[in-house]
């Protein structure tokens, strides 16, 4: 910086960025501490504001395929604020990959999250609800893309008060070995289904202000949101 404060420390080894890359705010306090290997960030690392408090939002690039995702801190949790779009072998499909992400069966949902993140448990979802308070569905749903409510001109869009942006991507109701032309995609615009580690799904509804936990066939496809370990 112009005031002489160190801005960044980047370790190199054999021509590659290798090790912990540190960036600093102009006041000298640590901004980020990110692990790198062969020029790629390989884990989430540490993110801090100039006053030393934890950063509440940012972007993280999946080291496996280079796709960048926005992340958000809600309460004491850090969530990836977009549906995962990691293209695992045969157990994931998508209708609008760039909008809704991919729909995963349970087996592939378990490997969908990038390094440093994991598939959330039912308790993780319940903790999220506790952090945002009553009418959690409305507060966490995206402000667009949800169907109109029956008999009204109003849409089931959320307020997205926390930047979580749950999108109504629906689900995939068929096993992975069923021909694509015979698979059933349903509930787009009406519901969002997100896997839990227990094999249930957290469901957001276009016509309800709450989020529910429901049973789901492990061979069928639901969206994935990831939480920091």
Model-derived segments and spans:
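Glycine/tyrosine- and acidic-biased, solvent-exposed loop/turn segments at the edges of beta-strands
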Residues: 1-55
